[in-house]
């Protein structure tokens, strides 16, 4: 009954209005009140401020400044093996695995359409049919900048307007085509591992999605699909990003989806739904790589804190 009510509210609540309100509040300078809100947020979500370049919460003029806080250079070591693709974000794995023709796993027993995720772009979808994917959810406690899994040349960016459903265990199980319905920014790269898409997906109260080459992509929310292209390789005007380099950020929320071409990479065997991710740790390896790569083990306390903060964890079950 309670879950039915929560799900109904996802359809009834004015999500766009709530998102605009949250974005407005998060951008305001409110002095002691801003610091109080940040302090309460840090305490509730157990945010590790020792990792931040500015660990003192008084250093942040707005909540948005705090939310996109940069980390110290030494806290996310980058796996430099050229055969290894690294995790693009801190968070937890929602799902990962094989793309079965046009089907991507959303939750156990629930798939969504690759082509729909890519806004009906059948040519782009053709690059990734029968490839592989990884979906990473960023909880409120996480660092909210998104980085490159490997070196890449940006070729295309598509802004897709859409719904702003929350991303959690309940919606993943019950909202069909959740990630193909929500607002998103699709970024297509040429890489040494073939084409790669990195998709930034919005949700309720995600105030904005930004990229390092275009700045703020949304808002404004104009309700139309927008597309930009860039030249290949060393051409004038091309955009090249290095493995581990920041490529975008969220101001509140949400989810990153990576798509890889068939026969190019192998996802790390130990990764599964609810695995905790840290930027720079192994996500996948080149198929011809002779050695396997594994993420560094994390303290149990960190894993528990991440799971407590993640709405992907089914809170109707005992998580231990």
Swiss-Prot record:
The record's listing under Pfam families reads:
PS_Dcarbxylase
Recorded GO MF terms: phosphatidylserine decarboxylase activity
Q: Which subcellular locations apply to this protein? A: Cell membrane
Might you report a single GO cellular component term?
Answer: plasma membrane
User: Which species is this UniProt entry from?
Assistant: Klebsiella pneumoniae (strain 342)
For this protein, what does the record note about how its cofactor is bound? Binds 1 pyruvoyl group covalently per subunit.
What's the protein called, per UniProt?
Answer: Phosphatidylserine decarboxylase proenzyme
Subunit structure as annotated in this protein's UniProt entry: Heterodimer of a large membrane-associated beta subunit and a small pyruvoyl-containing alpha subunit.
The record's region (Disordered) falls at 288-320
Family matches, as InterPro entries: PS_Dcarbxylase (IPR003817), PSD-B (IPR033177), PSD_type1_pro (IPR033178)
* Underlying gene: psd
Species lineage, top-down?
Answer: Bacteria, Pseudomonadati, Pseudomonadota, Gammaproteobacteria, Enterobacterales
Annotated site (Cleavage (non-hydrolytic)), which positions? 253-254
EC number annotated for this UniProt entry: 4.1.1.65
Q: Which domain of life is it from?
A: Bacteria
* Keyword annotations of the record: Cell membrane, Decarboxylase, Lipid biosynthesis, Lipid metabolism, Lyase, Membrane, Phospholipid biosynthesis, Phospholipid metabolism, Pyruvate, Zymogen
Residues where Pyruvic acid (Ser) occurs?
A: 254
| Described function | Catalyzes the formation of phosphatidylethanolamine (PtdEtn) from phosphatidylserine (PtdSer).
